Amino acid sequence: MLSLFFNFLTSCLWPSSSTTSHTYSDSKGKQDGLLWYKDSAHHLFGDFSMAVVQANNLLEDQSQVESGPLTTLSSSGPYGTFVGVYDGHGGPETSRFVNDHLFHHLKRFAAEQDSMSVDVIRKAYEATEEGFLGVVAKQWAVKPHIAAVGSCCLIGVVCDGKLYVANVGDSRAVLGKVIKATGEVNALQLSAEHNVSIESVRQEMHSLHPDDSHIVVLKHNVWRVKGIIQVSRSIGDVYLKKSEFNKEPLYTKYRLREPMKRPILSWEPSITVHDLQPDDQFLIFASDGLWEQLSNQEAVEIVQNHPRNGIARRLVKAALQEAAKKREMRYSDLNKIERGVRRHFHDDITVVVLFLDTNLLSRASSLKTPSVSIRGGGITLPKKL
């Protein structure tokens, strides 16, 4: 009965995707309505697959895969593969800025040190944060809302037999490890999350702000920092980092009642380094839109049990099917709902699946394949900030 109701509702209120969707394809990927995908491509150490589905009126997720030289000096090392997933909130400006600048900063610092390292990654995050702060300062007088725009920022770097994973916010990187004796796959989460729905993150916020009993507030059954935002770390969200951007003309809902004594949110990434092993088969990098619907283990089993080609798109579809199931509606009906309204049913979802070939990893120093650079989303962006 509820499914019939949604049929009626979608036909009356939301135009069918068959009349409003557009489909195109090129070497960078394919677009089908609100879904963009690159089913299969090669990176330095194997294959990869990408998919993005839009729910917000403006796509707030951005993503990229870069493979080849990881420095600005193309003739020298290190060589590797870089994956970035940037889940924006409050608007698309910060995630787009990160997509345009973070990888370039990483290459610059890697060139200075002639290597990849935790320090290189941290400096790249810091430079990106400082760059966006400059954008906010420049636009504050005419566009104060930009101070309340931010982005989660998850990256992975495969280089010299190591995997570096860095994160701010609540996107997630999960490794699929195969158990040789059984052929089964286990999920190993490599990223730390910074969402105050997690008790340890709330405890961290209380320890950093012992004089503020309202640093984390339960509002409408959801934990939020200062009753406003769920993540405790991000790029951007300058209104919760710099007091000069937490005042008029910023909207009242973003302004704090009491003076800001110190930055409330942090840009500092949690960084892990994993020595890659032969049983490390693939990596899933995804925004929280995927993980709201699928567990880590469910996701790695889908990848393990299906063909590689189009596997990111398959994960997105599995998440959408679960979102439809939660609303007791059909998947086909969910797909008819237009962007904007769709956000009431699920978030923007970005997925990158990176397969790892042990033989290619062992020969990394001798590989000189063409560079790869693909951005997820297939959306024409306005002029850079």
Curated annotation (Swiss-Prot):
Binds 2 magnesium or manganese ions per subunit. Keywords: Hydrolase, Magnesium, Manganese, Metal-binding, Phosphoprotein, Protein phosphatase, Signal. Disruption phenotype: Plants missing PP2C42/PP2C-D2, PP2C64/PP2C-D5, PP2C79/PP2C-D7, PP2C63/PP2C-D8 and PP2C68/PP2C-D9 exhibit an increased hypocotyl length, as well as an enhanced sensitivity to LiCl and media acidification. Its EC number is 3.1.3.16. Its cofactor is Mg(2+); Mn(2+). InterPro entries: PP2C, PP2C_BS, PPM-type-like_dom_sf, PPM-type_phosphatase-like_dom. Gene3D superfamilies: PPM-type phosphatase domain. Belongs to the PP2C family. This is Probable protein phosphatase 2C 79. It comes from Arabidopsis thaliana (Mouse-ear cress).
